[in-house]
């Protein structure tokens, strides 16, 4: 890991640990989870939010006012709003995506959940997602939350990352394996 990334993840981990522990002590983990999901979605969808958080062009006061307005508009809890205000005052909003991911991981661990990253060639139906989650739950022994993405280059099948293991049943991987086998023979 590069040094700047390591520093960023360290900063994010400190904020994540603090907000998680405060929410846990207050019994507000469900609200925090909802806030983190909303912030993660907003970060992914809004180039303006990413620009606000990462651009050095904005003054500290402008960042603070903007993030407070965003938090109010999104209806975030006071704990999350105050955390964002503190991050803005310290010019630490650039670690927001890492902090969100860290908090989500802490909440999942607290709930006995594990997140599986699933990449499919086509969107999964609710029935397929439920069957996959049940199968992965049997394998992992924990509740499984699916984080799905679509990659049409897989042609068909799935790539599932669960913890440190990866299961690749995609047509793309099978074709690559077949191509390698043919190279060895010929």
Curated annotation (Swiss-Prot):
This protein's GO CC annotations: plasma membrane; proton-transporting ATP synthase complex
Domain of life, source organism: Bacteria
Membrane topology annotation: Peripheral membrane protein
A Pfam family: OSCP
Subcellular location: Cell inner membrane
Keyword vocabulary terms for this entry: ATP synthesis, Cell inner membrane, Cell membrane, CF(1), Hydrogen ion transport, Ion transport, Membrane, Transport
GO MF, one annotated term: proton-transporting ATP synthase activity, rotational mechanism
PANTHER family reported for this sequence: ATP SYNTHASE DELTA CHAIN
Assembly with partners or alone: F-type ATPases have 2 components, F(1) - the catalytic core - and F(0) - the membrane proton channel. F(1) has five subunits: alpha(3), beta(3), gamma(1), delta(1), epsilon(1). CF(0) has four main subunits: a(1), b(1), b'(1) and c(10-14). The alpha and beta chains form an alternating ring which encloses part of the gamma chain. F(1) is attached to F(0) by a central stalk formed by the gamma and epsilon chains, while a peripheral stalk is formed by the delta, b and b' chains.
Family: Belongs to the ATPase delta chain family.
Function (record text): F(1)F(0) ATP synthase produces ATP from ADP in the presence of a proton or sodium gradient. F-type ATPases consist of two structural domains, F(1) containing the extramembraneous catalytic core and F(0) containing the membrane proton channel, linked together by a central stalk and a peripheral stalk. During catalysis, ATP synthesis in the catalytic domain of F(1) is coupled via a rotary mechanism of the central stalk subunits to proton translocation.
Protein name in UniProt: ATP synthase subunit delta
Biological source species: Cereibacter sphaeroides (strain ATCC 17025 / ATH 2.4.3) (Rhodobacter sphaeroides)
């Amino acid at each position: 890991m590069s040094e700047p990334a390591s520093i960023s993840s360290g900063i994010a981990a400190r904020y994540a640990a603090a907000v998680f522990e405060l929410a846990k002590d207050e019994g507000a983990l469900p609200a925090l989870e909802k806030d983190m999901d909303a912030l993660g979605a907003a970060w992914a969808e809004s180039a303006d939010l990413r620009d606000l958080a990462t651009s050095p062009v904005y003054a500290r006061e402008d960042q603070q006012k903007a993030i407070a307005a965003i938090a109010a508009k999104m209806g975030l809890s006071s704990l999350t709003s105050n955390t964002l205000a503190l991050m803005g005052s310290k010019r630490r909003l650039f670690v927001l995506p890492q902090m969100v991911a860290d908090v989500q991981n802490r909440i999942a661990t607290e709930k006995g959940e594990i997140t599986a990253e699933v990449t499919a060639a086509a969107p999964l139906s609710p029935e397929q997602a439920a069957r996959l989650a049940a199968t992965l739950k049997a394998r992992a022994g924990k509740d499984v939350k699916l984080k799905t993405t679509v990659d049409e280059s897989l042609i068909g099948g799935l790539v599932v990352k669960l913890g440190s293991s990866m299961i690749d049943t995609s047509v793309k991987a099978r074709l690559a394996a077949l191509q390698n086998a043919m190279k060895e023979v010929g």
